[in-house]
């Protein structure tokens, strides 16, 4: 869902981008005497601040790496991105979109127990987006593997036609599919005061968060950009503080929804 970076420009501050928005008048009566009625076209710019800035640095002793034939460090980098970075970025984006005021969503949370229930809920989602005149093109469905499986297991006489109304279908594990999350700062330990130990970092489902069943996203409705990524290797020869490989990773970006395109998000949660 990453957006087209050519449509944005940097703001006055380094942590901002400027997004163009356009509005225009509708049709008017045509006169055979005076011709066309003039209309107004307004182009405005919205300034949006980046809202995601996360990072970690790891060290692997040179001897540990040598004694494992390089597996120690090589495994660290790939596993960190696969098991920590990608799930958190997904969770942050989904929670941000789900928490946006004005999006379309199910009236009350519901558990979808059967494939027929899922089909009915998806049909309601597409119908609402159709009625809101959200373009059919570039509608993406994000759904849990469990619910997708119930649809695939339906009797072949049951209609799955609604599944063809999406540009693509992406399976999202429930463990990163919530309406709200808490990002741990990696420093604080409040476990002694009945709080959370945030030192391990990462994210958890927020107390107010609900499990998402599925989300339909019209790509032009979201602002999703990664401005800066640091993914580098510092060798023991370059490391001034220890005889160790160092792996610093940082990602800085934005996930938001255009305020005039909130109908392009449909949320169904438990």
Label every PLM stretch briefly.
Residues 1-3, 10-26, 46-51, 68, ...:
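Sequence/fold signature of self-assembling virion shell proteins
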Residues 1-9, 126-131:
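Short, charged/polar N-terminal "headpieces" of proteins
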Residues 2-5, 94-97, 139-142:
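Short coil/turn segments at secondary-structure boundaries
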Residues 18, 24, 37, 44-69, ...:
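Structured, hydrophobic secondary-structure cores that serve as assembly/anchoring elements
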Residues 29-34, 260:
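Short, glycine/acidic-enriched capping/hinge loops at junctions between secondary-structure elements
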Residues 32-41, 76-84:
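Short, mixed-charge, low-aromatic patches
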Residues 65-134, 145, 267-270:
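Alpha-helical scaffold segments that mediate packing/assembly in large oligomeric complexes
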């Amino acid at each position: 869902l990453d957006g087209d970076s050519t449509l944005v420009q940097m703001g006055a501050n380094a942590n901002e981008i400027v997004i163009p928005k356009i509005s225009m008048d509708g049709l008017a009566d045509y006169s055979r005497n005076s011709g066309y009625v003039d209309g107004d076209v307004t182009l405005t710019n919205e300034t949006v601040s980046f809202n995601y800035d996360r990072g970690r640095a790891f060290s692997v002793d040179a001897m540990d790496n040598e004694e494992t034939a390089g597996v120690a460090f090589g495994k660290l980098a790939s596993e960190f991105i696969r098991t920590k970075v990608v799930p958190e970025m997904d969770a942050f984006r989904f929670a941000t979109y789900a928490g946006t005021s004005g999006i379309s969503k199910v009236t009350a949370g519901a558990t979808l127990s059967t494939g027929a229930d899922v089909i009915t809920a998806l049909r309601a989602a597409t119908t609402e987006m159709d009625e809101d005149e959200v373009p059919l093109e570039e509608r993406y469905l994000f759904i849990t593997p469990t619910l997708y499986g119930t649809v695939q297991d339906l009797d072949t006489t049951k209609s799955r036609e609604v599944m063809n109304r999406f540009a693509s279908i992406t399976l999202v594990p429930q463990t990163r599919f919530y309406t709200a999350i808490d990002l741990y700062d990696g420093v604080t330990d409040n476990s002694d005061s009945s709080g959370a130990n945030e030192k391990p970092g990462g994210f958890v489902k927020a107390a107010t968060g609900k499990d998402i069943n599925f989300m339909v996203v019209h790509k032009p409705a979201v602002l999703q950009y990664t401005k800066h990524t640091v993914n580098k290797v510092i060798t023991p020869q370059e490391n001034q503080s220890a005889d160790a490989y160092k792996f610093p990773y940082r990602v800085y970006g934005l996930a938001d929804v255009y305020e005039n395109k909130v109908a392009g998000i449909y949320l169904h949660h438990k």
